[in-house]
Amino acid sequence: LEFRRVLFRSATGSELLAPGENWAPGKIYDANGIQNAARLRQMGFAVQRRHCSDDPALIVAELEELLTGCDAVVTSGGVSVGQKDYLPVVLESLGAEPVFSGVAQKPGSPMLAAKVEGKLVFCLSGNPFAAAATLEQYVLPALLRAAGRLEKGCILPRTKRTLTTGFSKASKGNRYLRAKASGGTVAIPGEGNAEAHSSGSLSAMIGCNCLVELPAGSGPVKPGEEVEVLSFVY
């Protein structure tokens, strides 16, 4: 199996615009398509991007086409519990074998993985940071292992580092924050402002090279505290 041959990435959503298209009310630009396709290419996978509107029949037809010419499919959007989140039903209609549905963390909890005709399909949240975080944590390790480039486990090295900035919100469940690590320290963008860490926020991701892990039940964290850091691999 030449697993890096082609990896297609399909974004769903009738509200999405391609870069360069004129913005209109109710529309958003397809940040996920650019961001995550670039990351997959950076890790050595050949990627072709596709977009599909919110039409179950069209999504079924596109996935059937994609699965004939690629080794794996990664999608963003259409996977939660909204009225137009059709991917779980679409996968069921394709006879998909579930691998898992949902992850106990924030962001990215709606993520699911399945196999269709033996090929991996990963469905990520449509929120940019949620998609980026789960791509790093789950998708890349699985694809690298399938390609014979990773023996087992997660590719994100874990270290303990000291916070130079805090985070003002308690974490009921496992939470992952974008952050910037340097030496033995790590900084959380936004000076502890929880609003800067919305799963839909892009600006706070600029320059980030790791995730800070806050376990379920954690309270707010302050500068000087030691935290677990998962560093991105390049």
Residue ranges and their predicted role:
Residues 2-7:
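Short, small-residue-biased leader/transition segments that mark boundaries at the very start
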Residues 9, 40, 74, 179, ...:
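Residue-level signal for inorganic ion chemistry
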Residues 9-12, 75-76, 104, 123-125:
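Short beta-strand segments
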Residues 14-15, 78-81, 126-128:
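Short glycine-rich anion-binding loops that position phosphate/pyrophosphate groups of nucleotides
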Residues 16-32:
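Glycine- and acidic-residue-enriched helix-capping/strand-helix junction motifs
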Residues 27-32, 53-59, 101-110:
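A general structural motif
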Residues 35-86, 90-95:
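N-terminal small/polar loop signature for handling phosphorylated ligands or for N-terminal nucleophile
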Residues 90-234:
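Flexible glycine/proline-rich
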